[in-house]
Amino acid sequence: MKLLLLLFFLNQPPVDTTAKSGRFIAMEYKGMSNCIYEITINDSLIMGAKVNGYITIQPNFGIGTSVPRDVMHNPEAYVNKKKAAKYQDKNMGNDQFISTDGQNFIIRRKDIKSVFINTTPKWGMGYYPQSGRIMIESPETAYNKTAIRDLILVGDQNAEEVLKMFK
């Protein structure tokens, strides 16, 4: 049985662990809870779209969502496709984007005071892999209600490549 499992994993296609241009997947803690964001970066804005709610380890006893262990290294496995589909309208304005989910955020790039990688593992992540934390400091605004964002890179992502997106 162990040999079959080993052969199964050895024959899996490689997971693309490089950050896609201007986009990455991150978790942010909200008190005792958390949520998953798809972060999109363009020339002037950083937009965080909530694409999944509370992520828990297994067994979750019906509370939250668990990412199966066999795909937990793939950042896309943390995204709820139904929630992500709400953001397919490329002509969505800022107000509509924010009203799609109250936890969404928009930060103007020119407002960023600092952005850096925190390599300290986030406590409470259980067995979920994390590739570092992107820390963004910016002023609170109507579109960004948190001055310091602690975005945990879930799965296998290259923190240095993600940081380059902000440069």
Task: Outline where the language-model segments fall.
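Acidic, Ser/Thr- and proline-rich intrinsically disordered linker/docking segments
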Residues: 15-23, 27-35, 43-167
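Sec-dependent N-terminal signal peptides
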Residues: 1-11
